[in-house]
Swiss-Prot record:
Gene3D superfamilies assigned to the protein according to its UniProt record, in alphabetical order: YcgL domain
Protein name: YcgL domain-containing protein PM0444
Domain of life: Bacteria
Domain YcgL residue range list: 1-83
InterPro entries: YcgL-like_sf, YcgL_dom
Signal peptide start-end: none
Organism of origin: Pasteurella multocida (strain Pm70)
Amino acid sequence: MLCAIYKSTRKMGTYLYVAKRDQFDVVPEVLRNAFGPPVFVMMFNLAGEKALVNAEKAEVRKQIETQGFYLQMPKEDDWLFKL
């Protein structure tokens, strides 16, 4: 399963995963407004062997299949956000 990954222009470290590139109709309007204009990062194969850095592939896939998207928030303990 391929998914498209976008980064937020308003919240550093926040990413949105959707099933198809530029398909945001499944994302609630409130979330789209808070996320800001999405910036395309890459297509990612959730069935492949490569791991995601800050998310579990199985959870991403499950969320995309059930609600149409997955929202990755920054880790609270990430030292870069404390600078």
